[in-house]
Every structure is written in structure tokens, then in C-alpha cells.
């Protein structure tokens, strides 16, 4: 059994503030340890549950945040940016039986600690076939095309509620309870590590490869906080304005859909100015 862990940071233990996840800040240095603790707890739990291999794919910002030297020696870690499937890189090779979303968060325009979708503030909403979409929902549709089920999700309490919609059978662990976008009631690292390890052990038997999903076409709509970003986004082939601050595109598969999404957000981020967005 091989498990892939997609590891994001905003939903990690103790994280509530932008500086907690911004590489190079003192707070980020401190929170890296708690982030690593969450991920390693999942690693240990999956091995407890019978996994033969666990591959961690770093999925936050520079994708160079986890402390490799503090991970269980049986695990392997894919670190660094510019990967074809970004947050779920590694799922496409046909050897992954289940995936865990560790440190995830809710989507842009919704309640939740550090809620966003890919870009911190420029994207104010994302919809997939008319349903508001978090990164978790988007990624769940991508991995489903490879027959890989989501078996574990960790983050704040609202992230767990969000995951009930796209991975109802997955085990969920709330490491903190949402108070506002920048505040939460947090559990200690020792407690969350124990909870995540236990949940991962329970989740391991759910890692059974399924028939690849064929649910397309997929229409993705993005809303931005400034109208000029809609014009910028239409540089990407197939992307058209659908409103003053919105664009939309349709892809036959989520593989193509997520790659177009990444292209749009990359181009849009280059057009955001420091003072006015």
C-alpha cells in the first residue's frame, strides 16, 4: 500500500496568521516544527495501519517548508516547486492507493482560518460546475481521475466540514476551531499529533484504488478582487470573461482543468501591485 500526503500549511496546528506561513519570518520558522509534527503523525499512523510506502508532497507556497530531518525515516518527501500537478504531484504514476490532505483549509470567500484558494486575497471565489470550490475540492476531483480516494483530511473544524462534501468517507481531524480568518482555538501539538496518528491508522484500510472517475466536462469560474485581473487572466487560451471581475473556462478533464487554473493564478499574481492589488 502506498499513501501520498499532500501537505499544506495554513491548516496546520497553531497556524492562524499570515506570518505563520510566510517563508522567512520568525513565526514561519516556529510553525514549521508544528507543521512537520502534523505530517509526521500522519506518516506514523499510515505505517501503523499497514502502509508499505508513504510519499509526502510539499504543497505550500515555495514547497520548501517541512523539516525533512524530523520525519520518520521510512517516509520520502517530494519538495520544491514547478510540478505538473502541483499540490497532488505524484498521484499520476499509477502506484498510489490513497491520498491524505494534511494542513488544508477552506476556500476563498468562505469562513475559515486563512481561507483562500491558491492566492491569498486576489482570488475572492472559485466555483467548479457551479459549486464553490476549495483547494481540497479541486484536488479531490483531480485525484479521482487516477482512481485515488481521499482517506484523511486535517485542518480547522470548517475544513473538516468542507471535506465532508468531497470525501465523505475520509477520516477528519480538526487541529483547531475557527474563530475568525486570523484566530482559532488551537490544540497543542502533542494532542493533535496523537489525534492525527490515530485517524491515519483508521484511514489506511480506506486506501483502495478505484475506477478512474470520468466526470467531465468541468467548468471553472474565478472571481478576483480587481477588474483588471480578469483581463490579465484571458491571456490563457480558453479563458474568457464571465463578469466584471470574473473569468471562466471549461476543460474535458480535471487534469487539464487544474493545469489551466494554475496558469491563470500564476499570470494573475504577476499583475498584482503592492498597494492597489
Q: Which positions does each model-derived feature cover?
A:
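Active-site glycine-rich loop that binds ribose-phosphate moieties when present
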Residues: 83-84, 120-146, 154-158
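N-terminal glycine-rich phosphate/adenylate-binding segment common to multiple enzyme folds
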Residues: 78-121
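Short catalytic helix/loop segments, enriched in acidic residues and glycine
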Residues: 19-43
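Glycine-rich nucleotide/cofactor/substrate-binding loop typically near the N-terminus or early
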Residues: 39-94
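Extreme N-terminal starter segment of soluble prokaryotic enzymes
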Residues: 1-4
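Active-site rim beta-loop-alpha module in soluble metabolic enzymes
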Residues: 142-204
Amino acid at each position: 500500500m502506498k499513501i501520498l500526503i499532500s501537505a499544506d500549511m495554513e491548516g496546520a496546528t497553531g497556524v492562524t496568521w499570515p506570518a505563520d506561513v510566510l517563508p522567512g519570518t520568525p513565526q514561519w520558522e516556529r510553525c514549521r516544527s508544528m507543521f512537520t509534527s502534523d505530517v509526521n503523525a500522519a506518516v506514523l499512523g499510515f505505517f501503523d495501519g499497514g502502509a508499505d510506502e508513504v510519499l509526502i508532497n510539499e504543497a505550500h507556497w515555495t514547497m520548501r517548508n517541512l523539516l525533512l530531518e524530523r520525519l520518520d525515516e521510512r517516509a520520502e518527501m517530494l519538495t520544491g516547486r514547478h510540478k505538473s500537478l502541483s499540490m497532488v504531484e505524484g498521484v499520476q504514476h499509477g502506484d498510489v492507493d490513497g491520498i491524505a490532505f494534511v494542513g488544508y483549509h477552506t476556500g476563498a470567500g468562505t469562513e475559515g482560518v486563512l481561507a483562500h484558494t491558491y492566492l491569498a486575497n486576489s482570488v475572492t471565489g472559485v466555483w467548479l460546475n457551479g459549486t464553490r470550490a476549495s483547494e481540497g475540492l479541486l484536488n479531490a476531483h483531480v485525484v479521482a481521475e487516477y482512481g485515488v480516494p481521499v482517506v484523511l483530511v486535517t485542518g480547522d473544524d470548517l475544513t473538516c466540514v468542507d471535506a465532508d462534501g468531497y470525501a465523505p468517507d475520509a477520516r477528519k481531524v480538526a487541529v483547531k476551531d475557527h474563530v475568525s480568518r486570523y484566530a482559532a482555538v488551537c490544540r497543542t501539538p502533542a494532542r493533535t499529533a496523537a489525534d492525527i496518528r490515530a485517524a491515519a491508522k483508521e484511514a489506511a484500510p480506506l486506501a483502495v484504488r478505484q475506477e478512474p472517475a470520468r466526470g467531465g466536462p468541468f467548468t471553472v469560474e474565478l472571481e478576483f478582487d480587481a477588474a483588471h485581473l480578469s483581463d490579465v487572466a484571458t491571456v490563457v487560451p480558453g479563458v474568457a470573461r464571465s463578469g466584471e471581475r470574473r473569468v471562466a473556462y471549461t476543460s474535458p478533464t480535471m487534469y487539464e482543468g487544474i493545469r489551466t487554473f494554475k496558469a491563470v493564478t500564476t499570470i494573475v499574481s504577476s499583475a498584482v501591485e503592492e498597494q492597489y492589488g
